[in-house]
């Protein structure tokens, strides 16, 4: 399949290139011993070094911009090796990031994330909050969320901390 793929960073956005294949290969190889009993970590290192040398790099943008609607133009495309694009025009679904955005919030928060309403779904437990603390800038808590960190009743959305990793807003509109 490698011969049929475009060179890294030469394909149109959201189309797999050789770096995507190398990344997948490295992940399979690093886990080979678990599934086959054969240690292929040396082969995984070769594949991941191909990815590292492919031209993709850590984007020099705020971490949250990796998860916004315009991550194909806001600098995130420097880092994202194989995105799955949902643009709302050519690809519509109730899958993709729809659940991830809607379930993370209630209605007032949903509006700030560029959606019409929230589903009041998932939240994180106290143990997660304690493991990362409040100082890690990659953890995006819902602003103003003063709900208790402990969850005693999993049917109550007002318990546990809410995270908002994904947003339907673009970097330039927020």
Task: Enumerate the predicted regions with their spans.
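Extended, hydrophobic/aromatic-rich amphipathic alpha-helical segments that build helical scaffolds
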Residues: 1-4, 12-52, 82, 136, ...
